[in-house]
């Protein structure tokens, strides 16, 4: 029996994780659950799974949850509580599914404690990739990617990197793949959040629509698999059946295929190196429609281009880019800027922020805060 600390329990990854746990009650126990503000949903989850701990990042939400729970579940609050619970001696696996930079600290603490980190938080590597990977190695932690593309590469590379030419991450293209760029200015938040293949939270849905999500995954792949930017390719694949591919120098290509359902990836991370039932039906190739592949349009999806540029530039560029994107997406979801403004704000923030090398986690956090302040100031010009 493995104890799971699930960070981001009320999000899409959290829900899928619990769905897999439900299939294997003899193998997994929910030790701790966390959420940001959704205390009402947490009441239901606490009643069902009876974790030892429930953490609400928001203090008022924690108080409401504590008042509503009648069992002896310990309710904690704050980001620091997340850091503490992932290092608990009874935590075996950490599902790091908190969206955004706020999820970095707890994932890193789990790695320092030598836990299995099932990483769904891209920002941990985008912000502190070198530090994170060094920590994983130093403390003998296990790092299993919980992302359809990176899980695919992880599986395809099991035979080793000898003779590796490049990897290719697939991208659905989001809801606006065939929308003319002339119509981008009028795109609404609800339209941007209507992903054709995947059920996701609003922030990551917007990232998918701008293709910043794929840009973050490019950076993540760079750190996860120790690849140069030139070894990472992106292809548009609207059906989301081929999750990613590995190309070797002898002309061989290994791809991982499956129905687009995050439970497959989650079950793999939970059962690795074995496999177990995820609740997802197997892919029927005979009934699968034709598979399409396109080169991404970097003029149309500027965020993807900005991500590649930030990776090539190195230093603090990736941290600055991520911070500006999080701020811009927040304003877009609040109907305060247009969809087309998102890449403009990111680009302006990158141009304003001084480029430098960061050598510590404190410097990363400080750079993140400064970049957010700059992005806020830039957005005032768009009012």
Swiss-Prot record:
GO terms for biological process: isopentenyl diphosphate biosynthetic process, methylerythritol 4-phosphate pathway involved in terpenoid biosynthetic process. Pfam families: DXP_redisom_C, DXP_reductoisom, DXPR_C. The keyword Oxidoreductase applies. Mn(2+) binds at residues 147, 149, 217. Its EC number is 1.1.1.267. Disulfide bonds: none annotated. It is an enzyme of class 1 (oxidoreductase). GO terms for molecular function: 1-deoxy-D-xylulose-5-phosphate reductoisomerase activity; manganese ion binding; NADPH binding. PANTHER family: 1-DEOXY-D-XYLULOSE 5-PHOSPHATE REDUCTOISOMERASE (PTHR30525), 1-DEOXY-D-XYLULOSE 5-PHOSPHATE REDUCTOISOMERASE, CHLOROPLASTIC (PTHR30525:SF0). Keywords: Isoprene biosynthesis, Manganese, Metal-binding, NADP, Oxidoreductase. Its cofactor is Mg(2+); Mn(2+). Catalyzes the NADPH-dependent rearrangement and reduction of 1-deoxy-D-xylulose-5-phosphate (DXP) to 2-C-methyl-D-erythritol 4-phosphate (MEP). This is 1-deoxy-D-xylulose 5-phosphate reductoisomerase. It comes from Vesicomyosocius okutanii subsp. Calyptogena okutanii (strain HA). The gene is dxr. Belongs to the DXR family. NADPH binds at residues 10-13, 38, 121, 123, 201. Pathway: Isoprenoid biosynthesis; isopentenyl diphosphate biosynthesis via DXP pathway; isopentenyl diphosphate from 1-deoxy-D-xylulose 5-phosphate: step 1/6.
């Amino acid at each position: 029996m493995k104890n799971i600390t699930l960070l981001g329990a009320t999000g899409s990854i959290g829900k899928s994780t619990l769905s897999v746990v439900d299939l294997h009650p003899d193998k997994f126990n929910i030790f701790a659950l966390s959420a940001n503000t959704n205390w009402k949903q947490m009441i239901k989850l606490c009643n069902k799974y009876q974790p030892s701990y429930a953490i609400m990042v928001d203090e008022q939400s924690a108080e409401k949850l504590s008042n509503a729970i009648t069992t002896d579940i310990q309710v904690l609050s704050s980001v620091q509580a997340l850091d503490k619970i992932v290092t608990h001696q009874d935590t075996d696996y950490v599902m790091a599914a908190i969206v955004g930079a706020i999820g970095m600290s707890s994932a890193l603490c789990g790695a320092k404690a030598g836990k299995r980190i099932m990483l769904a938080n891209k920002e941990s590597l985008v912000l502190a990739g070198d530090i994170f990977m060094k920590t994983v190695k130093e403390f003998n932690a296990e790092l299993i990617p919980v992302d359809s593309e990176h899980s695919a590469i992880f599986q395809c590379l099991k035979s080793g990197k000898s003779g590796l030419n490049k990897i290719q991450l697939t991208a659905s293209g989001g809801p606006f793949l065939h929308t003319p760029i002339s119509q981008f200015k009028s795109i609404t938040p609800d339209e941007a959040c209507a992903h054709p293949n995947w059920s996701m939270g609003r922030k990551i849905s917007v990232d998918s629509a701008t293709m910043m999500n794929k840009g973050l995954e490019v950076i993540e792949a760079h750190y996860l698999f120790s690849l140069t930017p030139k070894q990472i390719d992106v292809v548009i694949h609207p059906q989301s059946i081929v999750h990613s591919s590995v190309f070797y120098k002898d002309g061989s290509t290994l791809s991982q295929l499956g129905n687009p359902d995050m439970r497959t990836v989650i079950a793999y991370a939970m059962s690795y190196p074995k496999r177990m039932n995820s609740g997802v039906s197997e892919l029927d190739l005979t009934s699968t429609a034709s598979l399409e592949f396109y080169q991404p349009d970097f003029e149309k999806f500027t965020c993807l281009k900005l991500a590649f540029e930030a990776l090539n530039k190195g230093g603090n560029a990736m941290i600055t880019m991520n911070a500006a994107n999080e701020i811009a997406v927040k304003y877009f979801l609040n109907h305060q800027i247009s969809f087309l403004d998102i890449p403009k704000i990111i680009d302006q923030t990158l141009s304003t922020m001084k480029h430098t090398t960061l050598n510590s986690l404190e410097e990363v956090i400080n750079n993140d805060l400064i970049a957010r302040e700059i992005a806020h100031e830039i957005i005032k010009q768009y009012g």
